Amino acid sequence: MAFNPNPEKTTSCCSTSKAQDKCTCPKGKCECETCPKSTKTPGSGPCNCGVKEKVSTCGCNGSGAACTCPPGQCACDSCPRKAKSVSTCGCGGSAAACSCPPGKCACDSCPKQAQEKVSSCACNGSGGACTCPPGKCSCSGCPAQAKENPADQPTTCGCQGVGVACTCPPGQCACDGCPAKAK
């Protein structure tokens, strides 16, 4: 059987098993990820159908296996090579793919959120992720708030909502719950 240098080209590719056997995709025209020759043809171009053909924005065209995505640009949740990190923790629908710089986590389910510390204790919805400088804690649920060294606390006993972290000079305590109230 003679080799046919110009195999049948079709954009539908997958309509029948016979079409699949003869299918090669012209550049930029591959629409079916099951086309057996979609990635075996040098001229197939950005076919988005298999291992050799990558897409930069993770549109995936129905085939997550073919997709690689730059950070923050994944559009399909099922893409197995989804961006390993996004800078704003939008997470793209997959918390497992997200890491966040300090103070920039927007999704509570981000698994790496607790590893990132914020300096102002706004906590971004997750008290477990927060460390606060003396006198700068504004969220009472911050676990690092009560651990601050009393010597570093303000002397007017503002207490920022948590009395246990405050020390006050005699006659200057403003909060009754302060355990260190003037002795």
Curated annotation (Swiss-Prot):
Residues 89-110 are annotated as: Cys-rich copper-binding 3. Residues 1-35 are annotated as: Cys-rich copper-binding 1. Residues 46-79 are annotated as: Cys-rich copper-binding 2. Belongs to the metallothionein superfamily. Divided into 5 Cys-rich domains by 4 spacer sequences termed B1-B4. Each cystein-rich domain contains the conserved copper-binding motif Cys-X-Cys-X6-Cys-X-Cys-X4-Cys-X-Cys-X2-Cys. The copper-binding domains together are able to chelate up to 24 copper ions. Copper metallothionein that protects the cell against copper toxicity by tightly chelating copper ions. Required for antioxidant-mediated growth rescue in the presence of fluconazole. Acts as a critical factors for lung colonization and virulence. This is Copper metallothionein 2. It comes from Cryptococcus neoformans var. grubii serotype A (strain H99 / ATCC 208821 / CBS 10515 / FGSC 9487) (Filobasidiella neoformans var. grubii). The lineage of its organism: Eukaryota, Fungi, Dikarya, Basidiomycota, Agaricomycotina.
